[in-house]
Structures are given as structure tokens and as C-alpha cells.
Design a protein with these regions (language model features):
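Beta-strand-rich binding/interaction modules
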Residues: 131-166, 175-179, 187-197
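Extended substrate-binding grooves/exosites of carbohydrate-active enzymes
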Residues: 1-131, 138-144, 149-157
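Short beta-strand elements
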Residues: 200-209
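A short, sequence-level motif marking secondary-structure junctions
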Residues: 10, 166-168
Length: 209
């Protein structure tokens, strides 16, 4: 009764739905909902998808951002990121501190970062045979802020990359024809739609996807 929001730790998606069905007087935010240790974050889409159907569910926090590791040299003088147990200490939590979506040290993106990046995107592209539906989930930003590139590949090999002019207003959607038609020759064709920064920002260079 004294808080402005409801917060729980690692509830299931169904538990969140059940809670909001009984009491939606406050927004629901998971104080922690995925643990980015090892090869993880594979099911987080179930939670991010929930934001599309439950307005009072407003997301959550990942544990955590950066591996809690430090530089150490091995016996050959080569640096590596060390964690529990690498200094001969006992007891220890071993690699339990290595649970970030960015590596320690230079903070390079780990493979888990790609999963997080995809699920946190504010623009969705739904591709059909000859068109693409662009859904803009941004609250204030038009899609013309970005350069939209559409890439056609066959059996994993890029055939063409074209620019698609889009201008989808915030919280709306629009369908555009693809710059290439339906392919007739046999093979597995894939279409990749990317939105890239037109200009450099404080957090990324121009061209960042």
C-alpha cells in the first residue's frame, strides 16, 4: 500500500498475468527476471512479449550488465578475465560472478547481448512474401529517424541490400512493399530488415543497428 508499483523477483509470465487480473491498480515491474549467466537469456522473449498485451506490465531488470571479473595473467603471461577460484581462494562462488550480458575488461558484447538487443527493439518488422509491416513501438520517435535497410539472401548468401524509406509515426504501424518481389527460383530465401542510426549519438556511431 506504500509503494507506487508492484515488484517481484523471477515470477513466471503466467504469475504476472494472474496478479494483474486480480489487481491492476499499480504497474508491475520485475526487480529481476533473467539471470545472464552462461548460455542464458533464451526465454526472455516471453516477458518482453507480455508488454504488448499487458499495459500495466512495464518490464524488468536483468542480472546483470557486466561480468564481475578482473584481469589476471596466466602462467604464460597472457591476460584473461578471472573470477572466483582463480586466485586459489576457498571457499568461492567460482564463475557465479560471470553473469553479465557484457564481458568484463573492455566490456565487449557477449552473445547474450544479441538476444537482449532483439527483444528490446522498439521497431518490429513482420515480413511476408512481398511486403513488410513496420510496427513502431516508440513513444516519441518516428522511424524516419533511422535508415531502413532490407537485405535479401539465398541459402545464406546475400543477393541484394536496398534502402526502404519509412515514416511510421510513434505507436502506429504501416505496411510497405519490399524492394524486391517474390523469388521464383528454388532455394531458401530470407529477408532481413534493419534500422540504423542516421547520425552519431552519445551512445553509438552513425550506422549502428
Amino acid at each position: 500500500a506504500t509503494s507506487d508499483m508492484e515488484s517481484q523477483m523471477y515470477p513466471s509470465v503466467e504469475a504476472i498475468r494472474e496478479f494483474l487480473a486480480k489487481d491492476d491498480s499499480k504497474p508491475f515491474i520485475c526487480c529481476e527476471y533473467t539471470h545472464a549467466m552462461g548460455n542464458s537469456c533464451g526465454a526472455m522473449h516471453k516477458y518482453t512479449d507480455l508488454t504488448d498485451t499487458e499495459p500495466k506490465y512495464q518490464g524488468g531488470f536483468i542480472w546483470d550488465y557486466i561480468d564481475q571479473s578482473i584481469y589476471k595473467k596466466d602462467r604464460y603471461g597472457k591476460e584473461f578475465q578471472a573470477y572466483g577460484g582463480d586466485f586459489g581462494e576457498r571457499p568461492t562462488d567460482y564463475n557465479f560472478s560471470g553473469n553479465g550480458i557484457a564481458y568484463g575488461g573492455d566490456r565487449d558484447a557477449s552473445p547474450k547481448m544479441q538476444e537482449v538487443k532483439f527483444n528490446y527493439q522498439n521497431i518490429t518488422a513482420q515480413v511476408s512474401e512481398d511486403s513488410v509491416k513496420i510496427i513502431n513501438k516508440n513513444l516519441f520517435v518516428n522511424t524516419d529517424t533511422f535508415r531502413c535497410e532490407v537485405t535479401l539472401a539465398k541459402n545464406g548468401h546475400v543477393l541484394r541490400t536496398e534502402t526502404l524509406d519509412t515514416a511510421v509515426k510513434p505507436l502506429s504501424q504501416q505496411t510497405y512493399r519490399l524492394p524486391f518481389g517474390k523469388q521464383q527460383r528454388p532455394g531458401e530465401y530470407t529477408v532481413t530488415v534493419s534500422f540504423l542510426l542516421r547520425e552519431k549519438t552519445l551512445w553509438a556511431e552513425a550506422g549502428h543497428e
